[in-house]
Each structure stands twice: as C-alpha cells, then as structure tokens.
Amino acid sequence: MLIVTWDEFNLCVESITNTCRDKELCGVYGFPRGGICLAVALSHSLNIPLLQEPKSGCLVVDDVYETGKTLKTISENKKITIFVWFSKSKPQWWNAVNIIDPDEWIIFPW
C-alpha cells in the first residue's frame, strides 16, 4: 500500500508546473474525482483557467492511470497535454510524474 501525503501532492504539482510552464495552455481540466484536486492546484500554479471539460490546447490531469479507460476518451486529441500523478504502466501517449507497480494500492490525502 502506498500512502501519499499533501507534501508529495505539492511536489507533484511543482513537477507538472515546471514541465508545462512554457507551454501555451488554454486551461486545465481534471477528471472527477481524483483529477480535480490536481487541476485546481495547477490552475493556480500555472495561472490558467480551470475548465469544465477538456478541449484542444489544454492540460488534462488525473490522479492515477490504471486501465486507461478514463484517459482513452480524450487520447485522440493530439493537442491535449495529459499528465497523471501515478501511472500503473509505462506512459505511451500520456505523461506520468511517478510510475508504480500495477498491483499497488494508493491512499491519497483527500
């Protein structure tokens, strides 16, 4: 079991911010529920709008990539930048701050 803290959350936000700072992003969208916390924090740190739905040219975030079902819904849009905090498989068309074992259970701070 992996128990993550708010300090680790802040490091994740900092990592994504540093990677995306120079990108021209129209906003950030977070998949409900886990991606919303990341999206709000990144909206503030990148000074971009929080979006109610993903659109071309935006940053899309989620807490974890497991089966790919959630992110697959937007994977066809090549103009979207996708980040997850934890990925349970090697990133292919998305970005991950951390890659973990597929069997790992994650306890988030929220």
Model-derived regions: residue spans:
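PRPP-associated nucleotide enzymes
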Residues: 1-110
